[in-house]
């Protein structure tokens, strides 16, 4: 009997001492948008436990009492059989200090614990990008609270930084790079193999060459356009010149026709001129003219004299030649009568 009493005394003393130790506050981390269980440290539910109370500040959020229905402030809370408090779908408003108190069946408080709940946003998958011109690699994460970035090359840890962006200038590319983003509620990682040429062209040189090529194409197109326009203008000018020449030639061809018609008119009016020439041996004699004597014919066949020198002015007679007067031969000496040639 005495041993049983001593055992009960030591059990109560140990429970009360544990409750005193649990008064020290602890920190619990929760992920935004996810659920969490607030565990009672160093506690195990037994038949001697009569009541478990969870309070946030001075507000009761959940209560377990033996032989009674559990009390829950809202559907976001749930008290489990082991006394833990479950919070569903955490929001930033759920952060704060939660106090848990445990009572025994005889009404003695055997445990009192304060838990500080902090809500963190989970990290997103990091991104790796690099620039070959300056041999720089950058690791970046877009989402997450209290993020720490860790960079590895192969199995070698290169550096760590507590921020969302980290840059590193490499010296070799013998192994792939791995970027790891972590916080107290999540972690994500990404690995990339960096490929760069041995000697990369500077960015300004690439931009300059591209701009020069565009200018060359522009001026080439402008030159071709000007040449085509000039050829078209020359072709139009040549066409106009050909039209002018053709109109002039047609005008010249039409000009002599009236003269030819005028010349043909007298010919048609003079039937004698239009007749066929007489046969050889037949001499056409004009009426009223007689053949000249032989002496006069010989005169006509004599060579003509040279024209007078240039100093003297020669008056040329216009129109047809005038008829010459008849020359009668002198009568022979001794004959008193003048003999006339017989009429034809």
UniProtKB/Swiss-Prot annotation:
Residues 237-344 are annotated as: Disordered. Residues 23-202 are extracellular. Residues 99-113 are annotated as: CD58 binding region 2. Residues 320-332 have a biased composition (Pro residues). Residues 229-344 are cytoplasmic. GO terms for cellular component: cell surface; cell-cell junction; cytoplasmic side of plasma membrane; external side of plasma membrane; extracellular region; Golgi apparatus; nucleoplasm; plasma membrane. Residues 296-307 have a biased composition (Basic residues). Residues 23-121 form the Ig-like V-type domain. Its main location: membrane. Residues 122-202 form the Ig-like C2-type domain. Glycans are attached at residues 99, 106, 134. The chain crosses the membrane at residues 203-228. Residues 56-68 are annotated as: CD58 binding region 1. Residues 1-22 form the signal peptide. Disulfide bonds join 132-196, 139-179. One of its GO terms (molecular function) is identical protein binding. It is a single-pass type I membrane protein. SUPFAM superfamilies: Immunoglobulin. Residues 259-273 have a biased composition (Polar residues). Interacts with CD48. Interacts with CD58 (LFA-3). Interacts with CD2AP. Interacts with PSTPIP1. Interacts with FCGR3A; this interaction modulates NK cell activation and cytotoxicity. This is T-cell surface antigen CD2. It comes from Rattus norvegicus.
